């Protein structure tokens, strides 16, 4: 797991899943010949972006910054965004050695879904 130290806190990147967005929408006016050197779209013209959250631990606190997509989207929406049902934030938190019950603060920076 990727971790960095920030003052008295350890910051760990934890992933929920990845999601697909229309490549043309994402890159807008950038020519495909340029962006396709770095990323290849799938057959539905989507590029996939990691949906990552930040786990902060320190000073006796465990803070989760953003909470991923969750499990409430219906199958149609999950398919549209190409969400992997086997990748979950809970799984990555467990890999980081954290149980849900240990998180005392959740910060939601913005809402997408």
Which residue ranges define each predicted feature?
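Metallo-beta-lactamase
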Residues: 1-95, 102-113
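Alpha-helix capping at helix-to-loop junctions
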Residues: 95-99, 112-113
């Amino acid at each position: 797991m990727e971790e960095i130290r920030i003052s008295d806190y350890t910051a760990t990147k934890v992933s929920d899943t990845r999601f697909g967005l229309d490549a043309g929408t994402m890159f807008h006016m950038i020519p495909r010949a340029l962006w396709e050197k770095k990323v290849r779209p799938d057959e539905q013209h989507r590029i996939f972006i990691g949906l990552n959250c930040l786990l902060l631990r320190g000073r006796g606190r465990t803070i989760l910054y953003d909470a991923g997509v969750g499990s409430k989207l219906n199958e149609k929406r999950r398919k549209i965004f190409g969400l992997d049902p086997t990748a979950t934030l809970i799984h990555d938190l467990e890999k980081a050695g954290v149980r849900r019950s240990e998180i005392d603060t959740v910060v939601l920076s913005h809402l997408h879904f």
